[in-house]
From Swiss-Prot:
Disulfide bonds: C11-C68, C12-C29, C15-C63, C17-C27, C36-C43, C40-C55, C45-C53
Record's function text: These proteins inhibit trypsin and chymotrypsin, having 2 sites of interaction with trypsin. The site of interaction with chymotrypsin has not been determined but is not independent of the trypsin-reactive sites.
Keywords noted in UniProt: Disulfide bond, Protease inhibitor, Serine protease inhibitor
GO MF annotation terms: serine-type endopeptidase inhibitor activity
Pfam family, one: Bowman-Birk_leg
Stated name of the protein: Bowman-Birk type proteinase inhibitor A-II
UniProt record similarity statement: Belongs to the Bowman-Birk serine protease inhibitor family.
PROSITE patterns: BOWMAN_BIRK
Keyword Transmembrane helix on entry: no
Feature type site, description Reactive bond for trypsin: R19, R20, R47, S48
Keyword Disulfide bond belongs to the record: yes
């Protein structure tokens, strides 16, 4: 049961657009794993047009939900 206690060591298999905080969307992990590269431990929203969610080693990013096409 000590496997789900820490949220610091999770990594993303992919990122998706989660509209849980309108008028913004958040980039969140699709799946998490116990063992994975530290360079992919969260998701961020790119400044492309339209914005996309991608793996990153930085904190989560947000973009206007109106520009989220996925």
């Amino acid at each position: 049961e000590a496997s789900s206690s820490s949220d610091d060591n999770v990594c993303c298999n992919g990122c998706l657009c989660d509209r849980r905080a309108p008028p913004y969307f958040e980039c969140v992990c699709v799946d998490t794993f116990d063992h994975c590269p530290a360079s992919c431990n969260s998701c961020v929203c790119t400044r492309s047009n339209p914005p996309q969610c991608r793996c990153t080693d930085k904190t989560q990013g947000r973009c206007p939900v109106t520009e989220c096409r996925s």
